[in-house]
Design a protein with these regions (language model features):
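Short glycine-enriched loop/turn motifs at secondary-structure junctions
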Residues: 3-5, 55, 82-85
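Iron-sulfur (Fe-S) cluster-binding modules
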Residues: 1-13, 149-157
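Iron-sulfur cluster-binding cysteine motifs and their immediate structural context
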Residues: 22-42, 67-85, 101-118, 136-156
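Short cysteine-rich clusters marking metal-coordination/redox-active sites
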Residues: 17, 27, 61, 73, ...
Length: 157
């Protein structure tokens, strides 16, 4: 098996989260310039309905040590890539065919990858930890309750 570098990940603190979806919106705007939940690298999971309120939580790609999405991709190293510098697993929208193999391979009951229509092309969208952003993940920055934290790769369990 290929030697895969470790990556950091986003940690969510449920006791601090209000479910406001600022993280979701900021992600979509930063990456795609549009306010659209389907364009976010964060998957929004509806937990339950309580009277008039919908309880929701954000789900982030956990940047798995053994990224099943990466190995399932027929265009491995082209459509799903691993950054050699920081280990981040990310998707090349230009190369992705939208086949959904990565979504199916995600080991979580609620997959951390979306399929979205970007410029009339179905592609996979997932958290890439804003890998090219100097200030780190935009979702962490916009969360006023500090419910999101970037756990560096060196602190990964």
């Amino acid at each position: 098996m290929k030697n895969i570098p470790k990556s950091g990940y986003i940690k969510w603190e449920p006791d601090e989260c209000l479910g406001c979806s600022r993280c979701l919106t900021a992600c979509a705007v930063y990456h795609h310039g549009a306010v659209s939940p389907s364009l976010s690298g964060i998957v929004w999971h509806d937990e339950m309905q309580l009277q008039k309120f919908q309880l929701r939580r954000p789900l982030f790609c956990q940047q798995c040590d053994v990224p099943e999405c990466y190995f399932a991709c027929p265009l491995m190293d082209e459509a799903i890539c691993i950054d050699s510098a920081n280990g981040t697993r990310h998707i090349s929208i230009k190369e992705c065919t939208g086949c959904g193999s990565c979504v199916e391979a995600c080991p979580f009951d609620e997959p951390r990858i979306n399929l979205a229509d970007i410029d009339r092309k179905m592609v996979a969208v997932k958290c890439d930890l804003c890998r090219n952003r100097e200030d780190g993940p935009v979702c962490v920055q916009v969360c006023s309750r500090h419910a999101l934290t970037l756990v560096p790769k060196g602190e990964r369990l």
